Amino acid sequence: MVDTTIPGIARRYLQRLVSLGVVVERGVIFGSHARGEASKWSDIDLIVVSPRFDAPRTRDDINLLWKAAVREDSRIEPIPCGSKEWLEDKTSAIVEIARREGKELAP
């Protein structure tokens, strides 16, 4: 059964990132929540697509994603993905799975 609260949680998280200065093109929920197989213990797998992440990612970028996640909902597992990477990458298994099964969200 799909938890209908998850997209709202993810959108609020993306909006929090925007308020912190991150240009977010989209979020993509994938994994058990996208497949409708989540349990109450499932995390929220969320790709954050931003041109900011096309450049080499810094520890500060990763810390920002995780700190915002903890403040919104500790189940969020943010994964940074560059805009170009989202469109063109053919080597990342996670990106490929998210493209195939993911549910896209606008921030």
Residue spans for each PLM region:
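Catalytic core of pol beta-like nucleotidyltransferases
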Residues: 1-26, 35-40, 51-107
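Glycine-rich beta-strand-to-loop/alpha-helix junction loops that act as flexible
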Residues: 30-32
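Short beta-strand->loop micro-motif that forms the acidic, two-metal-ion catalytic signature
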Residues: 45-48
